[in-house]
């Protein structure tokens, strides 16, 4: 069967049938109601923006969010799975602006804020049905009908409560700070928004070395370097490093001041006229390069500890309105902070020559003007990492803006303490990416000068400036005397009321909440706490589990932690998982424009959702690493997991139907067949391992272990049990085999349920169970079946088989030719004899013999571990190496090696076996040495030929779509070599194929025909049909 679905079973169609069953039987709802009154397992589902269709990042996160609840449900817990929609903020506004053709904020104001917000409300759930269909097709169970929306009044009211709580605890203030600012969206961004995803990306800009003329020395200039020439109109100071040396050099008829440490990068053989420290330059005055002198405190040299001697000139131009370090320095020296840039990123009339021009577009003109006035020393284009808006992709600026802030810096100690109580996956995130971020938490600007969002609940008096913060709709209504119908602007701004301190009127301040503040309030806002569901919230907070991709350590994870710490002094979650990013096959970001990734819905309809689930969750992306995704990885899963397991199931069903077997549940005690015991050991070990690795959320190990079990079942247990199953009749031994198989298949389906929910459901149904596998408890496999000694024996046998096959391949001896014998040393004789028959059948060997030793085939060698010995032995290493190669060493009583007068400790060398030089028919694996008799005589060649003939005829049976029990007629048409083969092996060939008649002439109306190349003789034609005598 191909993974695309041609053949006996098409897995995507099978999944569609399972989906129909779940919908019809309300299986998800049953799984919730069946656990009523049980302990609740809480996981927070980070609400996606509903402004587009799901991508592979959403899909990966959703699969994890499905595995965990399914698993916890099977452990007996109730796991509510409520969906949520992130409705507010720049993502939605930006999409509406694009749809309406708006270019600026002014367009919105002219259109009307109320109408604009109505458009936002309409857009928000435009893709809701598409999301629902997509998530359902993935097989993820979630409650869409009870979804919360951040735009609902109930949710927003809780957001207001959270802000007021933070305010009342002293964690909120209003102030002007340097913050990331988008001139296109005309709003503040938080410091973590400026670092989301790939917000910092390469950008080419013009940098300039500008000459600032010293006030009292017209021929002398301070040389300063800037990468933002547009900030020069706001310059008020030049900063130098107090302890560094600065020099004044001759440059034509001019003199230039710069750091001595920066000379080499700018001048070849400078003539130094003066030398002093930066501290000695402090206080000198200069003339502005753009505009006029601002006031007496400006345009002077000051010292700063952030001035570095790397790139540039060692003199930094200071514009306090456009840099955090600049602003702090301005406060220190009481410098003015002129801001000649409007909200839309154009220069104001304060800079007449550039008024109305975009700051970036004006840069070339600024530089041209500096050049014409003789103040431009040098300009060059640089490529640097520069922050961009996470929604509109325009470059950000850092700008002094009035905003409402959460005092996150004051919460650092509590944030660190709360983080210490969280289990992070990967573990390094705890003290690394997330830990570093909260240890250096900066105050969070939570207000946005936008329209579509929960309102900042602050009212200010127009006369005395008194401020009131509202934490509920009831408070607003009580003060305004009007009913609150909608908390959105402009409706909320109709609520004005008298000031209690004077005769003034209180009106709401402008601005709405950062949408990250709203999503960070999700744990309580989604429950409308504290206005409703108080007990429910308190009993389910903090969450047991959350998962998002790694960048959310500076997004949703962070905002939840800040708000929870500030409001409740509590960590909001106990376990947090961060996954990596899924890149296209070519290693680039997935792009609709580049079409460098397969459509996920098409992929699921081609290979199935379970296959995509395994391909993603088994990959390193679940350990926080980025991966390159390709459709081949999904196709490979179908081959390695689906097909093997499904074929095992069909094999079981076919033969149990033939034998009219019905499982009793009695496995038989004690188990007298070693293969039965081994299969049940593997099942019990699998269940134990899954539980262990679910504790650490190591999905890659779980899926790897699942694959191991499928291989043990398919290529070991069933393969070695074929003779046992194929024999006629249903004796006790065969019945036990069937009982063990049924037990293993049904319990494996239950173990598989959280990880491959569609396949598990289909298999469980095929086994005759009426109830869904997802309504079952987690299986408890009897620990009496665990036998790691037996597992080690089986592992050794598989390794031995692999070694024999490798020696065959190396010597060009086909696996189809039987060997007279192999001899094995390094294994217990009893163990080898116990499994000799298995090995003879699997390896196509006449006789497996035990050997007491392997001295004539292999010799011991000592391998020194140079990485450990090199430093310790030094010059003596050479003599030791020579002695060991010559065999001139002894092993002492402690297991150490003594050579050339040096003692090598046991951990500093290894003792290995190696094949003797003259032998090519010997293999070594673990401590076993196997010798193969590779002499293939005529009789062995005939056996090999008839085995190949049988294999090809079996293929014809499949091609003709004949059942296992149907008898056939075959024709084998060839020369004398075929006659010779059939003389010796005709009866065996007929027994293998259920042959009624074997003819040496053409069949009438054959169902299938083929041509076979045998090791010797001419090509052989083979034909097959359903037996006419059957």
Curated annotation (Swiss-Prot):
Keyword Metal-binding in the entry? The reply is yes
Question: Which Pfam families does the record cross-reference, listed alphabetically?
Answer: Anticodon_1, DUF5915, tRNA-synt_1
Q: What class of enzyme is it?
A: ligase
Task: Answer whether the UniProt record assigns the keyword Cytoplasm to this protein.
Answer: yes
Where do we find the motif 'KMSKS' region here? 589-593
Q: Which cofactor does it need?
A: Zn(2+)
Q: Which family does it belong to?
A: Belongs to the class-I aminoacyl-tRNA synthetase family. IleS type 2 subfamily.
Summary of the function given for this chain in its UniProt record: Catalyzes the attachment of isoleucine to tRNA(Ile). As IleRS can inadvertently accommodate and process structurally similar amino acids such as valine, to avoid such errors it has two additional distinct tRNA(Ile)-dependent editing activities. One activity is designated as 'pretransfer' editing and involves the hydrolysis of activated Val-AMP. The other activity is designated 'posttransfer' editing and involves deacylation of mischarged Val-tRNA(Ile).
Tell me the protein's name: Isoleucine--tRNA ligase 2
Native organism: Pseudomonas fluorescens
Q: Which gene produces this protein?
A: ileS2
């Amino acid at each position: 069967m191909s993974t695309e679905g041609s053949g006996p079973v098409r897995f995507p169609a099978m999944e569609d049938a399972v989906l129909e069953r779940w919908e019809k039987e309300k299986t998800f709802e049953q799984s919730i109601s069946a656990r009523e009154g049980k302990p609740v397992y809480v996981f927070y589902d980070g609400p996606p923006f509903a402004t587009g269709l799901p991508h592979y990042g959403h899909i990966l996160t959703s699969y994890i969010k499905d595995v965990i609840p399914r698993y916890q449900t099977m452990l007996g817990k109730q796991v509510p799975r409520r969906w949520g929609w992130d409705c507010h903020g720049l993502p939605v506004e930006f999409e509406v602006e694009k749809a309406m053709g708006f270019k600026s904020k002014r367009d919105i104001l002219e259109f009307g804020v109320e109408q604009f917000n109505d458009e936002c409300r309409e857009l928000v759930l435009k893709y809701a049905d598409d999301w629902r269909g997509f998530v359902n097709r993935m097989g993820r169970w979630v409650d869409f009908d009870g979804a919360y929306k951040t735009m609902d009044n109930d949710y927003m009211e809780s957001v207001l409560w959270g802000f007021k709580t933070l305010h009342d605890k002293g964690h909120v203030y209003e102030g002007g700070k340097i913050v990331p600012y988008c001139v296109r969206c005309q709003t503040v961004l938080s410091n973590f928004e400026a670092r989301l995803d790939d917000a910092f990306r390469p950008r080419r800009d013009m940098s300039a070395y500008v000459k600032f003329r010293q006030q009292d020395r017209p021929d002398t200039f301070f040389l300063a370097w800037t990468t933002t020439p547009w900030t020069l109109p706001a310059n008020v100071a030049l900063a130098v490093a107090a302890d560094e040396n600065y020099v004044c050099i001759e440059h034509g008829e001019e003199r230039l001041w710069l750091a001595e440490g920066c000379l080499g990068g700018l001048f070849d053989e400078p003539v130094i006229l003066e030398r002093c420290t930066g501290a000695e330059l402090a206080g000198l005055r200069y003339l502005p390069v753009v505009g006029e002198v601002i006031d007496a405190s400006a345009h002077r040299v000051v010292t700063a500890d952030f001035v570095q001697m790397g790139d540039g000139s060692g003199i930094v131009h200071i514009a306090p309105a456009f840099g955090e370090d600049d602003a702090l320095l301005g406060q220190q020296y009481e410098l003015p902070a002129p801001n000649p840039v409007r909200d839309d990123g154009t220069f104001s009339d304060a800079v007449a020559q550039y008024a109305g021009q975009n700051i970036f577009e004006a840069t070339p003109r600024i530089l041209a003007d500096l050049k014409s006035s003789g103040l431009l020393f040098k300009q060059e284009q640089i490529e640097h990492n520069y922050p961009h808006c996470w929604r509109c992709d325009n470059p950000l600026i850092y700008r002094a803006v009035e905003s409402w802030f959460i005092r996150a810096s004051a919460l650092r100690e509590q944030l660190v303490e709360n983080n210490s109580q969280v289990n992070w996956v990967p573990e390094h995130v705890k003290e690394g990416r997330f830990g570093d971020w909260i240890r250096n938490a900066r105050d969070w600007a939570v207000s946005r000068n936008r329209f579509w969002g929960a309102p900042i609940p602050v009212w200010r008096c127009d006369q005395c400036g008194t401020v009131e913060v509202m934490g509920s709709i009831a408070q607003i209504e009580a003060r305004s005397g009007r009913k609150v119908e909608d908390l959105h602007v402009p409706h909320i701004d109709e609520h004005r009321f008298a000031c209690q301190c004077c005769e003034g009127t209180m009106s709401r301040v402008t601005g709405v909440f950062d949408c990250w503040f709203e999503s960070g309030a999700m744990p309580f806002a989604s429950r409308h706490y504290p206005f409703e569901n108080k007990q429910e919230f308190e009993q389910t907070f903090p969450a047991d589990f959350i998962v998002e991709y790694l960048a959310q350590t500076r997004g949703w994870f962070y905002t939840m932690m800040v708000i929870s710490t500030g409001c409740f002094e509590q960590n909001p979650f106990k376990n947090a998982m961060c996954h990596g990013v899924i890149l296209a096959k070519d290693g680039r970001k997935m792009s609709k424009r580049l079409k460098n990734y397969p459509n996920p819905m098409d992929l699921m309809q081609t290979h199935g959702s379970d296959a995509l689930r395994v391909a993603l969750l088994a990959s390193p992306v679940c350990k926080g690493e980025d991966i390159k995704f390709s459709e081949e990885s999904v196709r490979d899963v179908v081959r390695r997991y689906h097909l093997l397991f499904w074929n095992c199931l069909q094999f079981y069903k076919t033969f149990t139907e033939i034998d009219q077997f019905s499982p009793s549940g009695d496995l038989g005690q004690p188990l007298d067949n070693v293969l039965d015991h081994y299969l049940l050991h593997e099942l019990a070990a699998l269940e134990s391992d899954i539980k262990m690795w679910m504790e650490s959320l190591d999905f890659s190990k779980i899926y790897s272990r699942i694959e191991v079990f499928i291989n043990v079942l398919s290529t070991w247990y069933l393969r070695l049990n074929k003779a046992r199953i194929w024999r006629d009749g249903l004796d006790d031994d065969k019945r036990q085999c069937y009982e063990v198989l049924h037990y293993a298949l049904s319990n494996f389906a239950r173990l598989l349920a959280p990880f491959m929910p569609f396949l598990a459901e289909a298999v469980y149904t095929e086994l005759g169970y009426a109830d869904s596998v997802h309504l079952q408890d987690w299986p408890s496999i009897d620990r009496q079946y665990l036998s790691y000694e037996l597992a080690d024996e089986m592992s050794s046998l598989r390794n031995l088989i692999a070694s024999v096959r490798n020696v065959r391949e190396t010597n060009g001896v086909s696996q189809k030719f039987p060997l007279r014998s192999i001899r094995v040393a390094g294994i217990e004789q009893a163990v080898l004899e116990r499994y000799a028959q298995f090995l003879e059948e699997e390896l196509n060997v006449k006789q497996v013999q035990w050997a007491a030793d392997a001295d004539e085939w292999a010799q011991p060698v000592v391998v020194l571990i140079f990485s450990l010995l090199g430093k310790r032995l030094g010059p003596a290493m050479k003599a030791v190496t020579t002695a060991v190669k010559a065999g001139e060493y002894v092993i002492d009583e402690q297991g150490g090696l003594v050579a050339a007068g040096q003692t090598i400790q046991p951990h500093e060398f290894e003792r290995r076996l190696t094949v003797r030089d003259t032998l090519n028919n010997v293999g070594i694996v673990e401590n076993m040495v196997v010798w193969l008799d590779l002499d293939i005589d005529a009789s062995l060649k005939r056996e090999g030929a008839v085995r190949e003939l049988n294999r090809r005829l079996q293929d014809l049976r499949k091609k003709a779509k004949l059942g296992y029990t149907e008898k056939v007629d075959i024709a084998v048409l060839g020369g004398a070599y075929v006659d010779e083969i059939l003389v010796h092996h005709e009866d065996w060939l007929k027994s293998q194929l259920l042959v009624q008649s074997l003819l040496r002439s053409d069949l009438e109306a054959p169902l299938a025909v083929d041509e076979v190349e045998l090791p010797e003789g001419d090509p052989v034609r083979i034909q097959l049909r359903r037996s006419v005598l059957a």
